[in-house]
Swiss-Prot record:
Entry similarity comment: Belongs to the peptidase M28 family.
Cytoplasmic compartment segments: 1-60, 454-487, 540-550, 597-710, 765-777
Keyword hit for Translocase: no
Keywords, ordered alphabetically: Glycoprotein, Hydrolase, Membrane, Metal-binding, Metalloprotease, Protease, Transmembrane, Transmembrane helix, Vacuole, Zinc
Compartments where found: Vacuole membrane
GO BP term, example: proteolysis
Protein name: Vacuolar membrane protease
Function of the molecule: May be involved in vacuolar sorting and osmoregulation.
Length: 1012
């Protein structure tokens, strides 16, 4: 058969041909020329590859690169601590700080331990050495600087009776505490020069000072490197810094090393009784709830004080954590609660937050932190404190926020977050509210107006099914409704799979997130991307639509509008700023949606399009096979039917011909391609798009749409979402992935990861149908691998241990010696079986306490916490005979208890029924912290600064409730520094599996009790 060499008569080609008698050939198949040589083309007609066209290559590459370019830095910021400087900054000695931390953490030092007394004396010596060096530096200073006035208070007088606990109508817990705080006051250049605290009833004058706090006690099972050793050495370095020449504070600075934070914030409460507590108006609290890493800004009282943290060299944190406290999602507390809630100070809480598995365990030591972590907290403390003591305004000198509080003024609620650990944003919550309301109102109006204009111009292809030609009344299909419901279906299915995976992990291997949170993230992300891509490709295959992006962004805008409404309500009614990221998410989505609507102005009006289409015959065939196997009418150079000339460029089929023909090929990603698709794919471009503007089988009017605007849309949405959602997702994971050992259900953790995975990847939805198969296929393999791993892997390791909680209880009435471990079933029973002394004992386990935790007990090795004394003399008490007293309401009975314990300074009294009131002679009372409430007291905790103290406790109760007082006296021992003092604990540490961490269950490691 003779081949035609006239390019106007050829159909089988790699690019479409132009008509009007000109040979505008892009690239002809050389097989159509007898000599095998294709005609040469001018450079003006040669097809070019568009680097930003909305085609598979650019979409896949650009989207992937943007995600990688932002996610990788986020991961690096989250996991790598900025390096400490090689040389010491002025006024700071990092080597000295590290040596101090090593000494501080060389043993357990809870309040109820002899090591605690040693640390107390050592800290006083260190403060003295620092001040001596400071005075010498001022003497040697060539500028003739004068050393500041510095006062050191070894507070051995402050004590307090107060109450804690008690929810609703439940009885409360009474507390008597004797403080052992160390307070250093550096007089500011503008401070009153009088020692007003020496005068009875003396009050400070002038502007309020600044308080920096850290606690030097640890828990009985942790060395306290980050909880709160780094905070303590930071305070020591702050003393050094602000007493150095050139660094003297303008406002007075109080540095508090408090003792007793781990036991219900007792040290901070004792500080409230010191005269200097009336002087400070702002504060910085340094804490730790992890072991190493970055010190995060955990929470703040207001916008104004938060701005001083902005000068930190490496800021880190989000208001999301602060709102977690407000909503009760975070149950642990720090001294921040006392400074803000009792004293009325305004300030910040900076703390280490991960890994929680090391918190309150023997891995909270110097081996698991670094000098980089020390510098991260110290540098933030220096920058923040320097700003506060240099501030001369009156912002923090206003009316008191409450009765009995200092005159610190009232701040505004704030929004704050870091960006890549290098910059910090802070603004008022009211500003967020105003922006939110503006966006909620303006954005829909703008789109509505644009929609009206498009309709007036007859270019509103969205939601259009067909267009009627006015002259002939003929209806021409515009297929503008295609893809309308595609996105919500795909979103629900893909996201629903993640929720299903969350339930699957929570059921099969709930603790895998404890050690392998990144594997869980990888599984969630890869699953969502692959499923969304797969469903989008199927939808695009059967019903291709050029309006896919516009409809997707419209749906996203609608969803984000609803979320922004909810967030705005919480901002207005509850002062919750955690949804701040929704504002940026919504704004980016609106701009992307706006571009999709503006693109429609480039289209011909629908009536004109209908007239043009009515001049051409209908497309050949109505099913998908006609698209695949034959060119359609709009592909013909003249719009004619498929006739004999169609196959003029292909040899007549023979027995040796390919079944599919030379111009069709089946692929995984694009199913069956036509010849022109195949050729363009092989050359890296999709020429049907670059030449005619129509991609594949999308609507023919889409040829007029710009091909580059998708890049703008992606850049408006993608980077903003990645920065905010990625950071918050990592932050939440660090804070929550290891809470299962504390009795918190882990399903909420998996649901949170699933939700943040969806939020993180939603920006890909409008473009993912253009992805090549390579990335989704790779992610499918990642999903399969991580799913298998997450379901089958053992969830704990030596680096990510399971925390169990120890206590040994000795009942002197029955002689029963019981060792107990509280932990997650079935692991806690596996651990007990590894203990030699428990292997032959009858193990009794209580019913489930919370989220799978159980308390299992067995007769254990006898404790040796008191030397050379029989067990029945370890505690002693006596109770006076009750006496009655008439009141206006009911008769009241009184009794006096004398309680003492050997080699301890902590006991408590438990009552079978709540008592009405109690008091201790010589103890201070504070109306800001009532010592009793109407529901009564069920327990009194007693803490003394001296060993083997005798507490005198007066109690009273209603005579109609009980004639006699019944309860138990319990004394506590918490010193595990000496091997052999608690053999049961020593044995557990020796024989427990390496993936087990031991923490305290109660105030004491050993608790000995006797009834009365």
């Amino acid at each position: 058969m003779r081949r035609s060499t006239d390019p106007r008569n050829l159909l089988v080609r790699r690019g479409p041909l132009l008509v009007d008698g000109e040979s505008a050939i892009s690239e002809l198949d050389p097989g159509f020329f007898p000599t095998g040589d294709a005609p040469k083309m001018s450079s003006t007609t040669r097809r070019r590859f568009n680097l930003i066209a909305f085609t598979p290559g650019p979409v896949t590459v650009i989207s992937s690169l943007v995600y990688l370019a932002l996610l990788i830095p986020l991961l690096l910021v989250h996991t790598i601590v900025p390096s400490a400087p090689k040389s010491n900054p002025k006024g700071v000695d990092l080597s000295e700080a590290w040596n101090d931390l090593q000494h501080l953490t060389s043993g357990f030092h809870p309040y109820n331990s002899h090591r605690n007394d040693e640390i107390h004396q050592w800290l006083l010596q260190r403060v003295g050495h620092i001040l001596d060096a400071s005075r010498k530096a001022h003497e040697d200073d060539a500028m003739g600087s004068v050393a500041p006035d510095v006062f050191v208070f070894d507070d051995q007088q402050s004590n307090l009776t107060f109450s804690g606990g008690g929810v609703g109508n439940k009885p409360i817990t009474g507390v008597y505490f004797e403080g052992k705080n160390i307070i250093v006051y550096i007089r500011g250049l503008e401070d009153d020069k009088e020692n007003w605290w020496d005068s009875p009833g003396g009050k400070p004058k002038g502007k309020g000072g600044v308080l920096v706090n850290a606690h030097y006690d640890s828990v009985s099972t942790g060395f306290g490197a980050t909880d709160d050793g780094v905070g303590v050495v930071s305070v020591l370095q702050l003393i050094k810094f602000f007493t150095s020449p050139g660094n003297l504070p303008r406002k007075g600075l109080v540095l508090l090393l408090n003792n007793g934070e781990e036991d219900y914030l007792n040290g901070a409460r004792a500080y409230s009784q010191h005269p200097l507590s009336k002087y400070t108006h702002t504060f910085l609290n340094l804490e730790g709830a992890g072991a190493g890493g970055r010190a995060a800004l955990f929470r703040t009282t207001d916008t104004e004080v938060t701005r001083f943290y902005k000068s930190s060299p490496h800021p880190f944190g989000s208001v999301l954590a602060a709102d977690g406290f407000k909503m009760g999602l975070i149950r642990s507390e720090t001294d921040y609660a006392v400074f803000k809630g009792v004293l009325g100070l305004r300030g910040l809480d900076v703390a280490f937050i991960e890994p929680r598995a090391r918190y309150h365990t023997d891995q909270d030591d110097v081996r698991h932190t670094s000098i980089d972590s020390v510098w991260h907290m110290l540098s933030a403390a220096i920058a923040t404190t320097k700003g506060l003591v240099s501030y001369t305004g009156s912002e923090f000198d206003g009316r008191a926020p409450g009765k009995g509080m200092v005159n610190s003024g009232v701040g505004t609620h704030g929004v704050w977050f870091d960006l890549f650990g290098s910059s910090f944003a802070v603004f008022r919550l009211h500003t967020l509210f105003a922006i939110s309301v503006t966006l909620l109102v303006v954005c829909p109006i703008v789109l509505f107006v644009i929609g009206i204009i498009l309709s007036k111009m007859d270019k509103m292809y969205l939601f259009s099914i067909h267009e009627t030609i006015p002259e002939t009344k003929e209806k021409v299909s515009v297929r503008g409704l295609r893809g309308l419901f595609r996105y919500p279906i795909i979103l629900v299915v893909s996201s629903g799979i993640l929720i299903g995976l969350s339930y699957l992990l929570a059921k099969v291997n709930p603790f895998i997130v404890h050690s392998s949170s990144y594997a869980v993230w990888s599984m969630m992300l890869s699953s969502w991307i692959f499923m969304t891509w797969f469903l989008s490709c199927i939808a695009d295959f059967f019903r291709p639509s050029a309006l896919h992006r516009a409809y997707t962004f419209t749906w996203q805008l609608l969803v984000m509008w609803v979320l922004l409404v909810i967030s705005t309500v919480y901002v207005n009614q509850h002062d919750i700023a955690a949804g701040y990221f929704i504002v940026f998410y919504f704004a980016g989505t609106f701009l992307a949606t706006l571009i999709s609507y503006l693109e429609l102005f480039a289209l011909p009006n629908k009536t004109q399009y209908a007239r043009e289409q009515s001049q051409y015959p209908s497309r050949l065939g109505s099913n998908r096979s006609s698209r695949i196997l034959s060119p359609s009418a709009d592909e013909l150079p003249t719009g004619g039917d498929n006739n004999g000339e169609i196959y003029d460029g292909e040899e007549e089929p023979t027995e040796s011909s390919s079944l599919l023909g030379r111009q069709r090929r089946t692929t995984f990603a694009n199913y069956t391609r036509t010849g022109r698709d195949l050729a363009s794919s092989e050359s890296g471009t999709y020429e049907d798009h670059s030449e005619t503007g129509v991609f594949g089988e999308e609507q023919k009017w889409s040829a007029s749409l710009p091909t580059w605007t998708w890049v703008l849309q992606f850049l408006f949405v993608g980077p903003v979402v990645i920065m905010f959602i990625g950071q918050l997702g990592l932050f939440l994971t660090s804070a929550m992935n290891q809470v299962g050992a504390d009795g918190v259900g882990l399903l909420v953790v998996y649901i949170a990861i699933a939700v943040f995975s969806v939020l993180l990847l939603i920006p890909l939805s409008p473009f993912i149908h253009r992805f090549t198969y390579h990335v989704p296929t790779f992610l499918l393999l990642v999903f399969i691998a991580t799913l298998i791993y997450n379901l089958a892997a053992f969830p704990f390791s030596a680096e990510n241990r399971l925390k169990i909680f120890f206590v040994q209880e000795l009942n002197l009435d029955t002689g029963r010696n019981q060792v107990s471990l509280t932990g997650v079933d079935p692991y806690v029973q596996d651990i007990i079986r590894a203990i030699p002394s428990a292997s032959k004992e009858n193990i009794s386990c209580d019913s489930e306490l919370d989220s799978g935790r159980r308390k299992c007990s067995w007769p254990g090795l006898a404790p040796e916490v008191v030397q050379d004394e029989p067990t029945d003399r370890w505690l002693s008490f006596n109770i006076s005979k009750p006496s009655s007293q008439e009141t206006k309401d009911t008769p009241v009975l009184h009794a006096r208890l004398h309680v003492s314990g050997k080699n301890t300074r902590a006991c408590r009294v438990n009552f079978e029924r709540p008592i009405r009131d109690y008091s201790l002679p010589g103890s201070a009372l504070d109306d800001r912290m009532p010592h009793t409430l109407p529901q009564g007291i069920s327990e009194i905790r007693l803490w003394s600064r001296t060993w083997e103290n005798v507490w005198t406790v007066d109690v009273q109760w209603d005579a109609e409730d009980m004639d006699e007082l019944h309860g138990r006296v319990v004394c506590l021992w918490s010193d595990a520094n000496q091997l052999g003092s608690i053999p049961a604990l020593d044995e557990l540490r020796l024989f427990a599996p390496p993936w087990v961490a031991i923490s305290k269950l109660k105030d004491g490691l050993v608790e000995v009790s006797r009834g009365f």
